[in-house]
Amino acid sequence: MKTTKHIAALLAALVLALSLTACGQTAAKDDPMNPAIPVADGAEIGEGSKTFTTEVADQDGKAVTFTVHTDEKTVGDALQKLHVVAGEASSYGLYVKTVNGVTVDYDTDGKYWAFYVDGEYAATGVDSTDITAGATYTFKAE
């Protein structure tokens, strides 16, 4: 009888442990605030009829360039959907804090992600910039 109770208790503990494990965190790719693995230099990502180039230059001077294919309307929508950029929504639009796996935050390190369109400082934010096929969109940690 004691053995049966011990086996039942052990099985109950095992079932409980397995059910708690199944309730763990979701993968990074499912969290738009946590970009997935960085895109490699020269890669092509996404699917769609619009194509543009993205350049990322981090605070250490490392730069990568990759091609994005999408059907989204704005650069921000495309890059968020592909988990390349993440940030915080504000009254001014998306405050980009993470690009291609690298986080810079003006509040903590005095740097921010500057956004450029074809080499010129952008007049609009990434989430307000409509995609122009063939354009180059650049993020620089400044």
PLM-predicted stretches and their roles:
Residues 2-12, 18-142:
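Ubiquitin-like/PB1-type beta-grasp interaction modules and other compact soluble beta-rich domains
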